[in-house]
Structure formats: structure tokens, C-alpha cells
Amino acid sequence: MAAVQVVGSLPSGQLREAPRDAIPEGGNGFRRLSARLCALRPDDSSSARTEIHLLFDQLISENYSEGSGVAPEDVSALLVQACRLVPLNQNHLVSKVSQLIHHLLNRLQVIVDEQRLDFLLAYTISAIHQCSSWTHMEILQALAALVYCNGSKCQKYLLELLGETGLLMKLSDLAQSDPEVRRAAVHCMANLCLSVPGQPYLEEPYQNVCFQAFLTILQSPKSSDMDDITFCMLLQNALKGIQSLLNGGRMKLTQTDELGALLAVLKKFMFHGLPGLNIEMPMVLYPTPLPQYDGRTPIKPQQSESSASRPTLNKKKKSKVKPKKIQQGEEEEKESSGEIEAAPVTGTGRVNLHEGNTWCPSSLGVQSLPLDGSGAAGKDGVSSPFSSSSWKRVSSSESDFSDAEGGMQSKMRSYQAKVRQVALVCFLSTIKSIEKKVLYGYWSAFIPDTPELGSPQSVSLMTLTLKDPSPKTRACALQVLSAILEGSKQFLSVAEDTSDHRRAFTPFSVMIASSIRELHRCLLLALVAESSSQTLTQIIKCLANLVSDAPYDRLKLSLLTKVWNQIKPYIRHKDVNVRVSSLTLLGAIVSTHAPLPEVQLLLQQPCSSGLSNSNSATPHLSPPDWWKKAPAGPSLEETSVSSPKGSSEPCWLIRLCISIVVLPKEDSCSGSDAGSAAGSTYEPSPMRLEALQVLTLLARGYFSMTQAYLMELGEVICKCMGEADPSIQLHGAKLLEELGTGLIQQYKPDSTAAPDQRAPVFLVVMFWTMMLNGPLPRALQNSEHPTLQAGACDALSSILPEAFSNLPKDRQILCITVLLGLNDSKNRLVKAATSRALGVYVLFPCLRQDVIFVADTANAILMSLEDKSLNVRANAAWSLGNLTDTLIVNMETPDPSFQEEFSGLLLLKMLRSAIEASKDKDKVKSNAVRALGNLLHFLQPSHIEKPTFAEIIEESIQALISTVLTEAAMKVRWNACYAMGNVFKNPALPLGTAPWTSQAYNALTSVVTSCKNFKVRIRSAAALSVPGKREQYGSVDQYAGIWNALVTALQKSEDTRDFLEFKYCASLRTQICQALIHLLNLASASDLPCIKETLELNGNMVQSYILQFIKSGAEGDDTGAPHSPQERDQMVRMALKHMGSIQAPTGDTARRAVMGFLEEILAVCFDSSGSQGALPGLTNQ
């Protein structure tokens, strides 16, 4: 029966003709042969079959070079015609047409269109059902090529292929007698799971079916009738299938057993075929470090150690290796080396694994590698402590294999290495598809916490990094480790080993600290041993991830010193990627928990030290200059003794980075500088950018050291910002911003820098004059590069206020004019940066009393508050908050001219804009309410009396009340309560008599008693204690409501479900006690019955907390509460004095009860302090 009868007729389509002279030779051959094929009609004669057979052979043997000019639709049309010509009862022809489908689709990288795919799928599925079993292998290969990246277009056939009794389910089953057919069926399933971005994915039920099928295959032992290479290919296909399901986060592993089962097989096959290891894994890994997780055949500790701790043990064995054997090992390395970044899935249906790989090592950047003197090759042919590959120790005699057997062994090792690589890449996809907190439950299964000495749990990712003979597998393992470490700061922060551990059990914190130590040890061992540049780059990136997240302030000293000393030589490595990643690592060291005393000492190491202790055996080092000698330096202990504090020894790292940025490159290390432009005299751009980044991090973390180079760094910045490359310009601007920020920090009131250690103002003025006379203004006006403009704006906002006032007048005017002009920019990045910069300038003492500048800035900010970009509005709201802070500062100066001259109309506009902004997103809202509070505080009686202001004041206060009560972010509600306190400070507002008074107080009392966040409660209690007069609290009922709410809040000051809030309990009680005493100080005779009633019910509780308040002193709160016990005691005395002055009606007991309560508190204070001398003021009691 002809194939055409299986699926009905489908036109093969017209083949496109291309101009003859434009068609390459391969395209010509294809068109000639396809024209002959299209001319044929279905015919069962033997001559017709012979002709078709010959045509198929010719099409298969045709040389299809890249860019052969063959159109995908022509290939699809030809395959449809071929299938129409071959009836399903002709097994040999069906086999041949299947080979043709597989060959053409793979060779020409064609994905079949949906219409022809339908026909070809129906044909191949029918062929499997009807043809002899010996054809199934070729038909399945054709099916795999057809469904490749076409899973979403195969919906019609999914039930037939993947249903309970589906074709692929049966052929991939363990019961399938032919191992090759089983492997090919799994290959088809893996290709079905592969999807193209933007297209629909495989439906969830079928995803689960495939996942379970792949998992079953991986959990099943190798059957006796399957050879090792077929088994490796089967494993690869199953692993690639799972990877395709996980990629892009499409399939979620939500069940613990499901994830644990997958991790168990991944761990098993990460080590597949690694010599000397025979891993027996449980079916499921559970997220607890139990000893049964990882059993393996015991190995003598000496053997396990030999390739890591004791490299000398292998010397004899290395000398026995024959040159011929080494070449085979080298060939195997070339075959399995390459970049992990090359997506391993995309070739699933494009490589016939039977035919071996045809990768060209040179095209992958693998260096040709020499042999060492003894004739032994290392991982890449370079002698190292790990150079004797473990598989060479499998046999007791090197001559046990014939050449043919040796070739087979080499091929076997190559396939096993690929299984390990695919397992690692699949693990990478798994990591990306699960939450980090879930992943860290399995930390101990993959990360070592003790040196590897053959114990059951000692195999880990570091085993592969140190012992795998394939550089690509080592790179894969490192990339997985990097993914695990990335974002692990919170998890690792629990680590601690600063004190000696002498407990009966090992705390979790000590176990994590041990893991961190072991990771350092193993990665530094790997660094010494590695000679492949690509893998070396991965090791250094991995170290950078580890250094960024490890809590060195909680770990014993010397870990960073070892990393520091060992990485220095690699800064002069001949491969630019290694050099760049080495600088990245140094940047990570100077940014982690900065400033660290250990790093401070490392930065102060003398520049004259040599390389004697710093891995002088490391290859590819060029002769270093005086600052490039990468000193190992003395130990940390020696340094602390020999380097006096304040040593003027230059910082070698700053010198190095400056030289990389500004000095011409050396020829000796430019061999593989792919990043440098042709003819460039400088280091490659990535190297210079990384050096600028390190300088920026040094300025951020170790400014006291960096400031010694202030003017020199200024010249570096000017040079960078004057270059043509916008990236170099931008990084120069970032460095300028960081230096400016460092100078500002030195002059802040809370700075730890002594006045004589600060950079003098005249020097800062010189520095900024150099900047403003250099290329900075040009960068600010470079509208072609808005990112650079925004960076330059940020830099300009980091001028020290004291220096700005001393700049030449024309430079001051330049800064202000440029910023006000850029606020009109159409680019949102520039506009956001400008809005923020104006918010900084408006706080400068020399500008804040300039009414014209403040008004111009206000108008610019109000315009930005209406921008479509949230980021622009957020920055504008922050600046509006700063501007209103300036209004308050000016209000408190003796000179009233600013208030008088500031436009009332502009105040109205600011109030309206702030009200609108308070309805915006939280990022805008938090500063909008801050601004509202300041503006209402600033309003003068002359404003409030005007009818135009009455309505806007009411609206503003309603906006604040609604924000206090809303379920917004903590910062928003905190700022709203703070703003309400500012409103209460304005004596001109009718607080106490206005209708909004009760609403405002009710909002604050609601928050103080019930808000989940204690910082917001503290701020609302502070606001309630702001009014200075009794009448501002309104009626007796209003006063009683506030008093009762504060007592209730005190009672509930420990009621929280959030453990993090407990640290604010003491501050909350302090603020509530202060508010209660403040209310007592203002109470009138009519308020006393309510106070007495509350004290009768809760007097003991209130008394105990007020006693704590008096005795405790400062609680670290930020609300302005009196901080010394003497001051607090005085508050209670004043309240008692006030009570005594109240004229109560005859027979009134309330005043006496309240006075008794206060006297009792003071008496207890006197008694408790008697042994140490009475507190001031109690001696007359």
C-alpha cells in the first residue's frame, strides 16, 4: 500500500528555481535530484524501486555545505514527495526514506512547516505500526528529527505517541527488547519536550508523562543486553528531555519526592564513569543531611587524596604512560572540551551520535597543549598537581589494552564525560526552576563541609572540579556551583566559627562555616591545578560569588588572605577573560562586608614584595612591573605587627587599577585580547571597565585609603570621560559619584573620621574645579547617550556642600543651570537623575535661602511629579520632601524674609501636587505625605486666614488621615504619622477645634493600638505627644480616648506574631510612657476621673512600665524622647507638680489618686537608687 493512501493526498508543492549562477554546488545537486524525484509517480515495479533507492542514496551522499542555498520549504516538499513514492510494505525503502528524512533535516537544520509535518508524522507513525521491527530504529530517528522544536504542532498525535498505550511509551519501556530502539524512542520524547520561545509548550499532562518516563529510565539499572555507549546515549536523551521540560521555568517541581528523586539521579550521573567512584544513591534525596544519602564503594584514603592533597604519589605512574596513550587522552580532551554556554539542548535532534563528534577544537578556543617532560599529559596537557588523569590508574598495567581497545576506551570515556556534562546542565536548569530556600535544603548533598577522604558523604561538586579529566565537565560543575552560590548571602549569613566549637553536637552555623572553609580550600586547589583558560575563568567567577556572599565578619581570619594572595598572579595571565575575572574577584573582596580589618591590612601590604609565596608555578605570567609583582606579602599576624597605623605605603591595588585604565598595554599579555579594538594601545575595554569598577568599590568601602589618591583619580576620571567609548565615560562618572559620596560621608556629623583625617575643603574644591573645567559638562549635555547623562547628573549631585559654596561663581551657576535645563529632558533616565540632583542641591546651606533658586527648583519638581514614568515621579517626590525640609529650616531662622517672599501661589500648587502624589504608588506616596506634613507645618497665619487655603488644608489633612489608616507599606504609614506630628507643630492651625481634629486623633490611636509594624506604632505615639496645649487635644472625651488608647497600646506592646518586631518593644514602651506623662502634664480637672478609672484597672502595669522608662535611659529610639534617667525622672516630677496646681472641686478624689500614683513611682525610684546615691531632685522628698 502506498504511503499516499495512509494520510491522503498532499501536493508536494512547486520547487523554487534560483538563478543558476547564484546556486552553490550543493544547491545545484539538490535541485537536480529533487526535480528527478518529483517527476516520478508511485510505481511498485522493481526498476522503479531501484531508481528511487539510487536517488535516495545520491540525496544522502550529496555534499550540503553551510549556506548551500537550499530553502527549507524545498526540503519539506521533497520529503513529502519521497514518502508518497514509498509504500509501507517496502521495508527497505521505508528504512531508506527514514534515513533521508533524518539526514536532510539534521544536515540542513530544517524545521518542517505545520502542513507538511502533519503528513510526514502520519507517515512515520504508520510506518512503525506496519513495518518490520528492524526498520524501527531508522523510522524513530526520522520521527525525532521531525518533532524537533515542533512539539506544539504535534497536538493531533500526542495521544497516539504519549498516551498510556502510546507508541513512544511502549518503545521506551524497560520491557523493550531492542536497546537501540528504546534509546531512539527516548530521543523522540526528548525532542517533543523541546520548544521554541514564543510558541506554546507541551501540555501539562504530557509534560508529567514524559518527566516520569525519563525519571524511570534514569532510576533503572543498565540492562544486560545494552552496551555501555548506547546506555550513555540513553541517559543523555533522558537528561536532555528533563532539561527541556524545566527550561524557562515551565515545569514546576512542587512535590518534595519528585524533586528529591530528580536530584538523586542527577547526583548519580554527575559522577557517571568518573574513575575510582562507584556511587550508589537512594531513590530519593530528602532535604536533611542524613548519612544514607550518598554511599559509594569505599576507596582507600590515600587513593582519594592522591590527586588533591598528595600530588607526589602519582609521579611514578605518570612516567610509565606511553606517548601514544597520551595522544589518545589528548584527543578525548579535545573532543569533550568547549564552552558550557553553548546550549546543549538545541542539538538534540541534529547530531547522529553513532557517527561521533566532528567538533574542531581550534574553533572552540582550546589551546594546543604541550606534553610535559615525562611524556605525561595533564587535564589539558600541562603538568599540574592533578595532571595524571584518574582513568589512567584504572588498570594495573598500561599495556593491558591493544590500540583498538585503547581507542574504544577513549570513546567510552568521551561518552561518559558527556553524560556527566548533560547531568550538570540539567541540574543547572533544576536550580533555576526551584526557589533558593528549597534548594538550600539539599546543600549538604552537593557542597562539602569536610575534606574529601573517602567518607560516604564526601563526593560533591568539588570532586568533579578537582578530579574530572574533562575541562568541559569541570567548567559545568563550576557553573552549577556558581548558580547555587548566587544569592546565597542570607543562607550563608548564619555561619559562624569565630569561637572554638566544643559542644556535643555540631550547630548548623558551624556546619555552614565548615562548608565555606572547604569551598575556599577546594576552589584554591582547583585554581592551582587548572590550565584550561575557560575553566580557570569559571573557578575565579565561582570564588567571586563565594566571596560576595560569605559572612567573613563571622568567620576566622585568613580565608580572604589566602584568596587574595593566590589570585594576584592571574591579573597578568595571557587570557583576557582570566584577567577580567581576577579583577572581578578582587572587587568582590574589597566590597564584601567593607571595611574589613583583614582586607585593610591586605591593601596596605608593601608593593615591593615579590611572587615568592604566590604560586610562582602558575603558567602564563609576564614579567611584572614594580606595582604588578602581586605580593603574597607577610601573614596577617605579621602585617598587623610590622605595619604601623597610618602607614603611608601606597595601595598596590589602586596603583594597579589606575595603570590598567590609563597606561598602554604590554605586548606580553595581549595574545588573546578579543575585547580590545584593532589598533588600540590600551588594555581591552572589559579589563579597563573592571579596573574602574574596582576603584569605585574601593572608594565605597575603603575611602580613607582611596582619598590619598584623590587628585590622581580625578585625572583618571577626566581621561575616561574624555574618551569616545560611552561605557568608559559612564564608569568614570560612577567613580566620580562614589568619590563625591565618600567626601560627603566624611563631613557628616555622625562620621567616624576625625577632623584631621578628612580631605581638606580646599582640596575638594580643587578636585571639583578640575571636574567642572574638564569633560563633565560635555557629558552632561551629551543627549546621544542618555545613560551617560544620567550618570553625570548623579555625579554632579555628589558635590560636598561645603565645597560647592567655595567653587567659583561661574561653576556654581553652571551646575544649577545645567540641572534645571536637563529637567526638561525627554529621556526618563535623565529626568529622574536630574529630579534627584535638584533635591540634593535644595538642601545646600548656600542655596536654601535663595528664594528664586528654591522657587525654580519647586516648579521643576512639580513638573516632574506629573511625568508618566514612576521612577521620575518617585525621585521628584523625594526632592519635594527635601525642598519642604528646606522650608522648615528657613522658617526656624531669625530672619523672616524668606517666608514673606516665598510665593503663596506656589505653596498652593505644591500642596495640590502633594495631595495628588499621595494617591500614587507607594514609592511616590511615602515622600508625598512627608512633603504634606512639612507644608502644613510651614503655613503662616497670613496663609491660613485666606479662604483659598481653607479647602486645600482640609484636603491635605484628609489625605494624611487616609494614608495613616491605609494598608500601605510600612515606610508610607511611618511617614504619614511623622507628617501628622509635623502638622500638630503648627500653632496657627485650629487643632482641637477644627472638625478634622477627632479624625486625626482617631487615626493615630487606631495605629498605636493595632498596627502590625511596631515602628509605625512608635511614630504614631510620638505624634500623639506633639501638641503642647491641653485645648489642642479637644474635648474631654477626645482626651480620654487618646489616654485609654495609649494605655491599651502599652498593654499590647508585646503582642506580635512577627519575631522581628520584638526588638522594637522597648522603644515602643518608651514612646508610649513619654506620651502618657506628657498627657498628665497637660491634664485639666475634668480629665482626672478618666485617668483615675484607668489607673484603678491597670495602675500596676502602667507603673511598672513607667519605672522601666525612668531607669532604662536611652532605648535607641529616634523620636526625641529624653534619654537620661535624670531627665525622665524630671518629667514625672513636672507632671506631679502640674497635678498639684489643678484646682479640683471639693471632695474630688481623682486628683489625689493620680498624685498618689506619681508619688509612688518617685518613691520606688528613690528606694532603688538609694544604694548608689539619690537621683537629683529626690533628696527633698
From Swiss-Prot:
HEAT repeat ranges, renumbered to this chain: 159-198, 452-490, 514-552, 558-595
Keywords: Phosphoprotein, Repeat
Chain segments carrying region Disordered: 294-347, 371-407, 613-648
InterPro entries recorded: ARM-like, ARM-type_fold, DUF4042, HEAT6
Positions of post-translational Phosphoserine modification: 336-337, 399, 402, 643
Polar residues compositional bias, start-end: 300-312, 637-646
Protein name: HEAT repeat-containing protein 6
Organism of this sequence: Pongo abelii
Gene this chain is encoded by: HEATR6
